[in-house]
Swiss-Prot record:
The chain crosses the membrane at residues 5-25, 32-52, 61-81, 109-129, 137-157, 171-191, 195-215, 236-256. Belongs to the ZIP transporter (TC 2.A.5) family. ZupT subfamily. The keyword Glycoprotein does not apply. The keyword Protease does not apply. This is Zinc transporter ZupT. One of its GO terms (cellular component) is plasma membrane. Mediates zinc uptake. May also transport other divalent cations. Fe(2+) binds at N120, E123, N149, E152, E181. It comes from the Bacteria. Its main location: membrane. GO terms for molecular function: metal ion binding; zinc ion transmembrane transporter activity. It is found in: Cell inner membrane. Keywords: Cell inner membrane, Cell membrane, Ion transport, Iron, Membrane, Metal-binding, Transmembrane, Transmembrane helix, Transport, Zinc, Zinc transport. It comes from Shigella dysenteriae serotype 1 (strain Sd197).
């Protein structure tokens, strides 16, 4: 099994962490949760704009028109898909009601799981493609996606637990949303493999960079602010950028990057 695929699987499995936190009865600090989302956004923004996009544009045979065009395609494509999918409400992340609720709530829980699953699928592809192109960037993206998946697990397990009263069912449904990300990575592994030209890989990287920027700006940062309105999510973003930038410098100094 390839390292990029393992990273994708681990990132997707982080959904279970959020799921278990949601059913253990321990309220996760909103401040920590919001900071982790900002931290993940910072990692994604720095990697996307300072590493992935420049590397894609510098690839042999890649034209600026194609490179920036794919970046914009990934950006707008994510925003369009995001508008069509149901969203979790931050105030529902820590819902603790254990009484089964009406069927309407069950339907909402199913739609929420479906929406997050569809949202996670391209993230799995993005993680695999990034790690396949550059392993050090793959580690960074996998970490950012894993941090992002923890509150997603919370988002799924809350309404499902409230709708069914079953911890096992809630964890199962949260796991399904995480498996969608793993499925995206597996499909990328099966379809792309090593038989892909540098130009095609660079184009995919540019599109993935656009997806990551949109995810950070449109979802992670606003969600962090909604979860913890009393603190600025920019602190987490700046910390994520600083830590990721410092780690990349260390790797390049050591001759790994």
């Amino acid at each position: 099994m390839s390292v990029p695929l393992i990273l994708t699987i681990l990132a997707g499995a982080a959904t279970f962490i959020g799921a278990f936190l949601g059913v253990l009865g321990q309220k996760t600090s909103n401040r920590l949760l919001a900071f982790s989302l900002g931290f993940a956004a910072g990692i994604m923004l720095l990697i996307s704009l300072m590493e992935m996009l420049p590397a894609a544009l510098a690839a042999e045979g890649m034209s600026p028109v194609l490179g920036y065009g794919m970046f914009i395609f990934g950006l707008l494509g994510y925003l369009g898909l995001d508008r069509m999918l149901p969203h979790a409400h931050p105030q529902d992340l820590m819902q603790k009601s254990v009484q089964p609720l009406p069927k309407s709530i069950k339907r909402t829980a199913i739609l929420l799981t479906l929406g997050i699953s569809l949202h996670n699928f391209p993230e799995g592809i993005a993680t695999f493609v990034t790690a396949s192109s550059n392993l050090e960037l793959g580690f960074g993206i996998a970490l950012a996606v894993a941090l992002h998946n923890i509150p997603e697990g919370l988002a799924v397990v809350g309404p499902v637990y409230a709708a069914t009263g079953s911890k096992r069912t809630a964890i199962l449904w949260a796991g399904i949303s995480g498996l969608a990300e793993i499925l995206g990575g597996v499909l990328a592994w099966l379809i792309l493999g090593s038989m892909i030209s540098p130009v095609v890989m660079a184009a995919i990287m540019a599109a993935v960079a656009g997806i990551m920027v949109a995810l950070s700006v449109d979802e992670l940062m606003p969600l962090a602010k909604e979860i913890d309105p009393n603190n600025n999510p920019s602190y987490g973003v700046l910390c994520g950028m600083s830590v990721m930038g410092f780690s990349l410098v260390l790797l390049q100094t050591a001759g790994i990057g």
